Regions:
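Interdomain "pre-motor" coupling segment immediately N-terminal to P-loop NTPase/helicase cores
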Residues: 1-25
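N-terminal pre-P-loop "Q-motif" helix
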Residues: 34-57
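Conserved motor-coupling elements within RecA-like helicase/translocase cores
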Residues: 99-143
């Protein structure tokens, strides 16, 4: 038997052996701190996100389109890199994965970033990943922090398989952060 909802991820049944590998990452020189100008409100949101992450609290960053939600997560990503945590920025759409991976590579001074989506898999020796939400199902108990951008967007929103994949990709004390302009009541 197999799960009809999960068939898009490849067949997996009782005869399929599942395993988990921790990929060690050697010490990589930290990037220069990104120089991003935040408004006072963005600064407060960024500080709260960092603080909540340190306290292992899941967080919703709720702001209108164009309010700079991406810039708000720069500090938590930078701090995670400094603390050698494994972090993932997951987005439902691959075009946004491509756009953000170029932007983060530039803003984080060429720091290696693993980029994964349906058309591309660039695995770097790094603790920073940018991927589509579909890729999260392949990472069991792996990330310290998962940030899901556009959490309200298709195909992530309302897809139990993808939502569960995000949760199971986290380590035991892992933290989820959601970015959205229009979060569902379930996320709020």
């Amino acid at each position: 038997t197999y799960c009809r909802r999960c068939i898009d991820f490849g067949r997996s049944d009782d005869n399929f052996v599942k395993f988990h590998i921790n990929i060690p990452v050697s010490k990589i020189e930290a990037p220069k701190k990104p120089s991003v100008r935040l408004s006072d409100v963005q600064e407060v949101a960024s500080e709260r996100l960092v603080d909540n992450t340190r306290k292992a609290l899941n967080t919703l960053v709720w702001a209108v389109c164009g309010a700079g939600k991406t810039e708000i997560v720069y500090e938590v990503i930078y701090q995670a890199i400094l603390e050698s945590k494994t972090i993932c920025l997951a987005i439902p759409r691959r075009d946004v994965v491509k756009e953000l991976s170029e932007r983060f590579y530039r803003d984080f001074s060429g720091y290696p970033i693993s980029v994964l989506h349906g058309e591309e898999k660039v695995l770097e020796e790094s603790n920073f990943y940018i991927m589509t939400t579909h890729q999260l199902v392949k990472y069991y108990n792996y990330f310290d922090i998962v940030i899901i951008d556009e959490v309200d967007a298709f195909p992530y929103s309302g897809d139990e398989c993808l939502e569960n994949g995000a949760k199971t990709s986290l380590k035991n004390n892992g933290v989820l952060a959601f970015l959205s302009a229009t979060p569902s009541n379930k996320i709020k």
